[in-house]
C-alpha cells in the first residue's frame, strides 16, 4: 500500500510541477508487479528516468536522475542514504522527503529558466576595452547596464544580478523579519540558489531548548515554503564550509547575511556579506546594487614551508598591513607566483579572515605603489579574490591579463617568511610569532570554526599523534574540536584521525560555530583563557568575560598537551610531509567519489579564458530583454522629510556590533526579536545609561571612526531604531553597518570636519535638515553628502518597504538616478582637504 500511494503521489508531482504525464498502464511496472521488476523507491526513480529519457524529455530526466543521486548518497554527504533499500525498509518520512525533492528540483528547472541569464562572455578581449581588475570584471558582467563601454571604475553605481544567497538559521530570522514585519511572505527568485544552514546556535545538545526549537522550525519552514533544494538543515555544515566546497564557482556574485561570506573568495567568487534585509531583497529579486569599490592587490612571493597553512598566512598579512588601513572598504585581490602554491583550503582560511576589523595601529608594510588611503580607518571590505579559473564555468582572464588594471595599492608578502603566529586578545591583528610568546597558560584549547579547514584538522591530528608517540601527557584543561561539516567528519573518521583527537581528550560536538560565537551549547567561562583556531578574538566573543587568542590548528594541537603555548615546529619535525599529503589526497578522492549535488554540474577539463560582456544602457541581455532602467514603470515616494531636532549622545571611535563597545549583545539577537525588544538591550554591557538618555531626548548619536564595525548583524541598527535613535553622525561607518542604516530607513551621516566634533558635545542641541543636507549645532552649519538612493530609501522607510511598494522593480527604481557626484571625485575632494573618506566610499 505504501508503494502504491507513494507512486501515485510521485506521478501527481510530475504532473503538477513538471507538466509530465505518464500513461496509466506504466503504473504496475513501477510497483514491481511485473515479473523480474526490482522493488523499492530507488528502482521507481530509475524507471521514471528511463521512461522520460525515452520520451525525449532529457531535461526532466536529468532532474529525476539528480534526485535519484541525492536519494542514494550517504547521509553524511548530504543525501538520504537508501541505496538498495526495499519499500519496507524506507520509512514514511523518507518517502515524503523524496517527494519533496522531486517537487523542488522540478520547480528549480522552471525557476532557472525564468531567471535572468547573464550575457555570453567574450572569447577574446575587446580592443576598445580598458583593463579591469577581477572584481570590476565580475560586477561588470553581472550588471544590467554599465555607464561606459570601455570599463567600469570605482564609484560606478551598478544594478546587478546575483548568483547565490547564503544565510544561517540566526540570520534567516532577521531576513524573514524584514518582510513579515510588513505583512509580506519571504520569496526566492530561484529556489535552487538559496543556501541555508543551521550552524550558529543550534546543536544536538540543545535541541530541547525552546529558542533552538524555534530556529529549527524556521529552517524547516523556509525549506517547505520556498521549496528549497539547498536547505542544509541543522548541524550538517557551518554555512561557509560546504558552500565553498560544493557550490561556489569562480566569477560568481554571492550575497550572504554573514560577514564571513567572503570565504567564497577562495574560489575567485565575489562574495559579500550584507545586512539581513539587504540580502532578503536580493533573495526575492535576484538583484542588488553596488558602487564599484576600489581594490588593492597583494602579491604572494616565495615558497611557504609545507606545514604553513592559510591561518598563519593571513595572520602574517594582518601583522604587516593591520586592519582598517590600506584595505579599508576595498576589495582585496591576492595573486602572484606564491598564490599558486596555496591550496584551496589555505585560500579559504585567508579569505575567511578578510572580514576582521579595528584598531589604530599604523601599517608596517610599505606599499609598492602610490597609496591614497593612509588617512582611513574603516572596515575591511567583505570580499576576497584569487584571480584564477572560471566565470560560471568559463574561465576569467588571470595573470598577465590583469596588467594595467587599476589598484589603489599593491603589496608583496613573502610566504617564505611566514611562521607560526598568534593573535593576542582582543584583536586579530595584534600578531607576533608563537616563538616569542611560548609559556602562556590556557584553561582551554579549541580547534574549529569555519576558518579551520579540512587540511588544518588533518595536520593538527598528525601533530597530536606525534605528541602521543613521544609520550607527552595531558594536563588538566578543556579541549574541543569541531570539524566544519559532516563530510569532513566522515573523512577524518576514515583516516582514523578522530580517534587521535579522542585519545588526546578532545570533545567532538556536531559541526557548528561552537565557541567561535559563544552563544550556543559551548560558551567559555568568564575569566577563562583559551587558545583557539577560530577567526575572531574580540572581547566576549567566546563567552562573556572569556579571553581568547587565535592561531593555527597545529599550534593549538601542540599546545594542548600541557595547556601552554608551544611552537608546533618541534612536533612537526616528527610529522611526515608525505603522510600529510597522502591523507589530503585520500580526502580529495573521497570527495570526488560522489557526483555534485548541483543538478547539471560539470567539471571543466579544458580552461577557456574569457572576458566579461558589458551591456550598455540599450543593450540586450541573453534572453533579449532591454536592461535599461524602467523609470517610467516605477514611482518613488517624493514626500519631503522634516528636520530632526534632538540632543546629542556622544560616542568614541570603533563602536562595534560584536566587541566592546557593543551595540547589541549576540544573545539578544536569538529568536525573533522586534526592534523594540532589541532596543531594550542596546549598549547594555558598556553604556547602561544610554537607553535612558535616548528616551529623554538624546536621539542623535555622534560617533567617531568605523562606527558599526564588527559583523553583518542588522540587529545593531535595528536596536538603535527600536530605542528611538533617529540619526547617527560619524567620521566613517563600517561598510555593512553604513549600508544597513538606510536599508532600515535610518539616517547615517558622514562628517569629517573637526569643527563639527568640537561643537557637537554631549547634550548639545542639534538640528539635522535632511532635505537640505546640512547640520546645525552650536550656532554653526555643516553640509553633508547623501546619495539620492539613500535619501529615497529613508523616504520609503527602508528597503523592505520599498520592495513592498515596487516589488521586483525595486532596484530598477532605486538605481535610476545616479549619485549626485562620482564617488571617486568625492574621495579626491575629501583627501585634497586632508580629511577621511568615510562612508562616501561605500558601494
From Swiss-Prot:
Underlying gene: AMT8-2
Note: Gene clusters encoding host-selective toxins (HSTs) are localized on conditionally dispensable chromosomes (CDCs), also called supernumerary chromosomes, where they are present in multiple copies. The CDCs are not essential for saprophytic growth but controls host-selective pathogenicity.
One BP annotation, GO: L-amino acid biosynthetic process
Family: Belongs to the aconitase/IPM isomerase family.
The name this protein goes by in its record: Aconitase AMT8-2
Keywords: Iron, Iron-sulfur, Lyase, Metal-binding, Virulence
Listed pathway(s): Mycotoxin biosynthesis
Record's function text: Aconitase; part of the gene clusters that mediate the biosynthesis of AM-toxins, host-selective toxins (HSTs) causing Alternaria blotch on apple, a worldwide distributed disease. AM-toxins are cyclic depsipeptides containing the 3 residues 2-hydroxy-isovaleric acid (2-HIV), dehydroalanine, L-alanine which are common for all 3 AM-toxins I to III. The fourth precursor is L-alpha-amino-methoxyphenyl-valeric acid (L-Amv) for AM-toxin I, L-alpha-amino-phenyl-valeric acid (L-Apv) for AM-toxin II, and L-alpha-amino-hydroxyphenyl-valeric acid (L-Ahv) for AM-toxin III.
InterPro entries named among the record's database cross-references: Acnase/IPM_dHydase_lsu_aba_1/3 (IPR015931), Acoase/IPM_deHydtase_lsu_aba (IPR001030), Aconitase/3IPM_dehydase_swvl (IPR015928), Aconitase_4Fe-4S_BS (IPR018136), Aconitase_4Fe-4S_dom (IPR036008), AconitaseA/IPMdHydase_ssu_swvl (IPR000573), IPM_dehydratase_rel_enz (IPR050067), IPMI_Swivel (IPR033940)
EC number: 4.2.1.-
Source organism of this protein record: Alternaria alternata
Superkingdom as given in the UniProt entry: Eukaryota
GO molecular function: hydro-lyase activity; iron-sulfur cluster binding; metal ion binding
UniProt-annotated binding residues for substrate: 258-260, 536, 541, 712-713
Positions contributing to [4Fe-4S] cluster binding: 450, 513, 516
